[in-house]
A protein has these predicted regions:
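Hydrophobic, amphipathic alpha-helical faces that serve as interaction scaffolds
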Residues: 97-110, 143-182
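Amphipathic alpha-helical dimerization/coiled-coil segments
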Residues: 104-127
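C-terminal all-alpha effector/ligand-binding and dimerization domain
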Residues: 2-7, 17, 173-227
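Hydrophobic packing residues in well-ordered alpha-helices of helical domains and bundles
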Residues: 94, 118-121, 137, 141, ...
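Short linear motifs at protein or domain termini
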Residues: 1-111, 226-227
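Amphipathic coiled-coil alpha-helices
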Residues: 101, 124, 131, 140-147, ...
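A ubiquitous short alpha-helical element
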Residues: 86-91, 106-111, 129-132, 178-186
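Short helix-adjacent coil turns
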Residues: 36, 116, 128, 132-135, ...
Length: 227
């Protein structure tokens, strides 16, 4: 497992830090998995991880269990904790699930949304348009769809979304990297206009149009399946 510092610029720390040691370990390991620093199939030894991060094994053990529940880790045949390898089948299954879950979310959101929800979506779109890397784009894209699901007001729908949220972002990082390599950073932001149209339909309280736009948006990614 590679736990050496990476060249990815660190995010600016918030004004008030209240994360527990477990949460800090969770965020750091999740970031490394999402960004591909820890690759699929790579073991994550609890003791080595604790030593490298300068913490005890207890918060590491708790963080690894959380990451396993999030779908980013799994147990291999030898019982080791390894980063989950996400491939074409995972992509297809997550995509088809997103079509149903997020389509429904958009439809419900058009009726249930608040002004705060609209502000959160608009703020996300602005940040997405200003993003400077595949990792930022993936994080903000996943965040946009998470806001939709949360704003739907449907608790079980949000639970369903949470089961795919992090694997979805991990796959998005790969997709945006491929898209940027094939085109450019700016061209990779084609989702910006899709997101704006979705928000306008939701703002206008048009449930069926909102659902249709989300489904069309998700379907655009069909051809960008990872190997």
């Amino acid at each position: 497992m590679r736990l050496v510092p990476t060249s990815t610029p660190a995010a600016q720390p918030p004004l008030i830090l209240r994360l527990s040691v477990t949460d800090q370990v969770l965020c750091e390991l999740r970031r490394r998995i999402l960004h591909g620093v820890i690759e699929g199939g790579e073991p994550i030894p609890e003791s080595q991880c604790a030593e490298t991060l300068g913490v005890s094994r207890v918060p590491v053990r708790e963080a690894l269990l959380m990451l396993e529940r999030e779908g980013l880790l799994q147990r291999d045949r030898r019982g080791r904790t390894v980063a989950r390898t996400l491939g074409g089948r995972d992509y297809e299954e997550i995509l088809t699930l997103r079509l149903e879950v997020e389509g429904m979310a958009a439809r419900l959101c058009a009726d249930a949304r608040t002004e705060q929800d609209l502000e959160a979506l608009e703020s996300n779109i602005a940040a997405f348009a200003a993003a400077k890397s595949a990792e930022e784009l993936a994080s903000l894209d996943a965040e946009f769809h998470g806001i939709l699901c949360s704003a739907s007001g449907h608790r079980w729908l949000l639970t369903a979304w949470s089961t795919i949220r992090w694997p979805f972002e991990a796959l998005l990082v790969k997709n945006f990297r491929s898209y940027i390599q094939a085109t450019s950073l700016e061209e990779s932001k084609v989702s910006t206009e899709d997101h704006r149209r979705i928000v306008e339909a939701i703002r206008s309280r048009k449930p069926h149009e909102s659902e249709l736009l989300v489904r069309q948006h998700i379907s655009r990614w069909t051809d960008w399946k990872p190997a």
